[in-house]
Amino acid sequence: MKEGFTKYLFKRLLLGMLTLFIILLSSYILMRLAPGDPTKSSMLGEGAGTQLSSEKSALARNDSLREKLHLDKPVYVGFFLWFKGVLHGDFGESAAVDKGRPVASLILEKLPVTLSLNILAILVTYLCAIPLGIFSAVRPDTRLDNAITFFLFFLYSLPVLWTALMLQAVFCKGGWLPVFPLKGLFPEIVPGMSTWAILGQTLLHYVLPVFCLSYAGFAGLARFTRSGMLEVIHQDYIRTARAKGLSESSVVLKHAFRNAMIIMITLFAGILPSLVGGSILVEYVFNIPGMGSLSMLALSSRDIPLLMALFAFGGALTLAGILLADILYVIADPRIDFESRI
């Protein structure tokens, strides 16, 4: 089985690299074919200077930038020149957001903020959704189960942007119950503040963004957990376990839950990339300096090197989630036969 899993993993890695290459090629082609000139977008915000200085030097800078970004070459040549740099660990330099700065450095600066948000959101999602899904599954079609189902569908239907804005309007400064900070992720440290006070203020800054990132995943996972548990709980081996006199908690948690984990693992593969995608809106609304805000700046300024690096990161994260799910399958159920999948 180990040999079969190794072969399967190797095959998935090769397929993942090919998929990532196609994602990057498609993204580059779309950006190059989009209307407008990215070099002109990147020059917005530069000082206009005197009118005397100008048209020739502006045109010279524009031509120089086009050459640097390989925009003076055919699309396929431009992509392969960029990809050649990536293979040597060079993702290029930002053309607009932070001119001349390596995009890898920009991403590494913003990544810890987004990671902290997303890790907290994943923990909240799984720690809250799985118990609720199990609780609902062992009480099927009761009033409480129906109320939980209605609540979960209601949560799942809420748009992230609207929810974030409504939470700000109600719970932030100027709202009905101004408990949480309006923006940012870190408090303003006043001299004399204790460590506990700083920690408490930091947690308050995290509450609304983490809720916005996790509520949809929480609702979906709770429903998937309920469905998976209901499917397993009526199997013959569960009836046998009950007939042996095992306690209900042992039957549910030790036997039913373990077999229902496959469904939850499948959902995990999609949670990582969806959280990063949701970070774009959440970080924008709450003015959080993470990967989401960086993506918005890169899109609005058409910073091609930075956008390509972000696409590479997002694509790699999606494929890593799928690969991690495959590994978790083996841990959850060693009976899975990978030989047949090769």
Give the residues covered by each predicted segment.
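Hydrophobic alpha-helical transmembrane segments of multi-pass integral membrane proteins
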Residues: 21-26, 75, 119-123, 166-167, ...
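Residue-level signal for discrete positions within transmembrane alpha-helices
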Residues: 16, 110, 114, 150-153, ...
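Juxtamembrane/transmembrane-helix interface segments of polytopic membrane transporters
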Residues: 23, 27-31, 36, 168-173, ...
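An internal, D/E-rich "acidic patch" concept
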Residues: 5, 68-130
